[in-house]
């Protein structure tokens, strides 16, 4: 799968294929009514002939191993129309196609003159590795109209329910330093068209620019350290940052960032998950404690649920690479173990990074802790109080 392929960026010295474990498979039926209020990208402006009726869906994903794309589609019965673009380019490419009753998709892309330049063919199906079972993904092959240059693609629906003129617009930091031998490719979201989200924009921008600066500083120090010389043929250091929107409403934004960094000369890279949970109404970044009643043992409740879920998973899947000793330490009721939490409609989406509960090759592990398991602890008038009712 393409989500698995993204990890290749961090294993360049050995070109090892890394399997992202614990992907819980979901029934392969087509779901048309999921997230019908999704807001398209800031660049989305329907081209001539695009349908004006139907349900709108916003997707993020990749073509090939690492060509990221944003896609906005309008689904009207069997008809699909919309646009997609590459964040590092920013130019819309028109889309028009069909979807049948079994979810088989064929979408042609065309240039400004109407000439077809490519075709997406794949399957519209429930998303895997998603905290919300009603979200969808489209997976398949992109090719030129004649079938050449065939490349795998995967795009996942984003749960955007922001009203008004506000639109998500990805920003890209891309840098290559040949002298210091590092490359940076980092994305972070901005919300255009509504001043309510200005503080969120500053927080998201600051989070990623600081991480990029820290990476560059570390590379500069490493490069000047005479005891840290590496052969010229070794792969350059890299920092790659991508994100998923876990929740986006007028009041709350939850963004999950995946940061993959590789230090020149290392056996493999590292993967770190950072989540920005932002209270738009009150203009502040949320701490996990903000969701719960005073003195509530929320860490104990979250820990207990995650331990049971991961133990069940390990019993059912002998190839899961989950490690009992790692799990004992990595799921204990300590704040450090639950730094990567995201807000969703269904519950708190907890991410355990590699080596926290499983081997590196297993990839990050995910647990959705439903609000029903935390209902008695959640602050009724707090940020997620309405979800827990």
Which positions does each model-derived feature cover?
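C-terminal motif of bacterial Sec signal peptides marking the signal peptidase cleavage site
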Residues: 19-22
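Compositionally biased intrinsically disordered regions enriched in Thr/Gly
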Residues: 26-34, 38-79, 83-389
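Bacterial N-terminal signal peptides that target proteins for export
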Residues: 2-10
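Hydrophobic helical h-region of N-terminal Sec-dependent signal peptides
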Residues: 10-16
